[in-house]
């Protein structure tokens, strides 16, 4: 009370009815709003001896001593034990009819979200204000930068926003939402706004090229549950452990497997040791594809093996050849970059080649992107995920802050992501004024 004599206080909140009723006559609601903060639905409010859940049945009583109710977000959009959203309650609509504002609490970027949000905290905030049914009047968040940007930039975003950089390249389709390299993952990546749909090419024993994110079927399929485990082998040049590799099974056998939720680096090995030419197989598919005749369609061919890219370059200059640097680097010699520019049109590097990290925090930015740009090589960065555990703490557990740091901070040309929808939203209308 003493502080209110010297400072303007906009809100005073309390979980106790007695406290709010004792001060309601001392404040002008036009300058200071009283907020009843709800705790868990089964917890007891000490003044009325009712649970907070039962208090919601008497909103007119609350209106006598408060102008706002602050409720956990689960009061509005409950989440089931399966971590999927349940139908919304009528709380916001009912409270507005009673003349009360509604603030939602318990928002944090580094907590588990309902699967409906694809681990994107912005989607969660928008669910509370842009759902076609109701809109809360405010949110209480541990990471205020995220709702601030979401409401300012993405609220009521149309279907045809202005498109700018970066180029959005999927990682095994929308593999954050569906098992990678499946029709569902690719269809969602397209609908989510990806510019380039990736296909990590692996070869079957009968010479059929397939899209699969790993040459080891144990990594991406249910092969361990079937009779093919007798085909387990160890090939140190491919990986340290044992595996069941795609070139050990026919296409017909692989089609019987189920994909699991979870980079083509094997072309040279397949050609030298298995007699399978990825280059020939890919070129054959491209030559037969309608995409190859559509000049407006962009095709990128990626490899971490310079010899493979040189073979593609000798076969056709129609496509963009992308060299993948398959390890994190802090620097690059001009002579090395000059060599790369002889057989590649662009380069893929890892996120830590731009912003090194240590103990989950960022180090100083490298000049790798700047050096590659000096040789007119576009730079694409991999891999971007929405899950907060994949991001350094400097990004506030916000995937948009992370993307922005690479696009505006490091001037990369494209992002490779398991969640194309997030990158598409960022590109459409997102503006983050964050200096790292």
Language-model features, listed with the residues they occupy:
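Phosphate-group recognition and catalysis centered on beta-loop-alpha active-site segments
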Residues: 1-436
């Amino acid at each position: 009370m003493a502080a209110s004599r010297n400072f303007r206080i906009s809100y005073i909140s309390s979980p106790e009815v007695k406290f709010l009723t004792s001060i309601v006559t001392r404040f002008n609601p036009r300058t200071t709003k009283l907020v009843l903060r709800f705790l868990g639905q089964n917890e007891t409010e000490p003044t009325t001896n009712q649970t907070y859940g039962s208090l919601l049945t008497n909103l007119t009583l609350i209106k006598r001593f408060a102008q706002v109710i602050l409720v956990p977000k689960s009061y509005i959009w409950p989440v089931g034990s399966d971590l999927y959203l349940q139908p919304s309650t009528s709380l916001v609509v009912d409270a507005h009819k009673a003349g009360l504002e509604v603030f939602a609490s318990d928002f944090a970027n580094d907590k588990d979200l309902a699967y409906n949000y694809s681990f994107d905290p912005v989607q969660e905030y928008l669910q509370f204000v842009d759902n076609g049914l109701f809109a809360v009047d405010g949110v209480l968040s541990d990471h205020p930068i995220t709702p601030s940007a979401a409401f300012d930039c993405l609220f009521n975003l149309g279907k045809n926003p202005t498109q700018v950089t970066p180029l959005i390249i999927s990682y095994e389709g929308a593999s954050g939402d569906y098992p990678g390299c499946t029709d569902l993952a690719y269809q969602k990546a397209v609908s989510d706004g990806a510019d380039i749909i990736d296909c990590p090419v692996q070869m079957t024993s009968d010479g059929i090229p397939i899209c699969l994110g790993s040459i080891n079927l144990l990594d991406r399929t249910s092969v361990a549950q079937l009779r093919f485990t007798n085909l387990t082998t160890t090939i140190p040049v491919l990986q340290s452990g044992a595996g069941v590799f795609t070139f050990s099974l026919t296409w017909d056998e692989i089609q019987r497997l189920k994909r699991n939720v979870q980079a083509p680096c094997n072309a040279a090995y397949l050609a030298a040791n298995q007699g399978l030419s990825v280059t020939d197989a890919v070129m054959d598919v491209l030559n037969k594809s309608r995409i190859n005749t559509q000049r407006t369609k962009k095709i990128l061919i990626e490899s971490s093996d310079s010899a493979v890219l040189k073979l593609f370059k000798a076969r056709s200059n129609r496509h963009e050849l992308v060299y993948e640097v398959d390890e994190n680097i802090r620097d690059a010699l001009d002579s090395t970059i000059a060599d790369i520019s002889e057989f590649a049109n662009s380069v893929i590097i890892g996120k830590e080649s731009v912003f090194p990290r240590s103990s989950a925090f960022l180090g100083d930015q490298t000049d790798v992107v700047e050096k590659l740009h000096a040789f007119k090589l576009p730079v694409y960065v991999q891999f971007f995920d929405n899950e907060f555990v994949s991001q350094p703490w400097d990004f506030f557990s916000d995937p948009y802050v992370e993307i922005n740091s690479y696009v505006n901070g490091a001037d990369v040309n494209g992002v490779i992501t398991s969640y194309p929808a997030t990158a598409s939203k960022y590109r459409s209308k997102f503006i983050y004024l964050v200096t790292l």
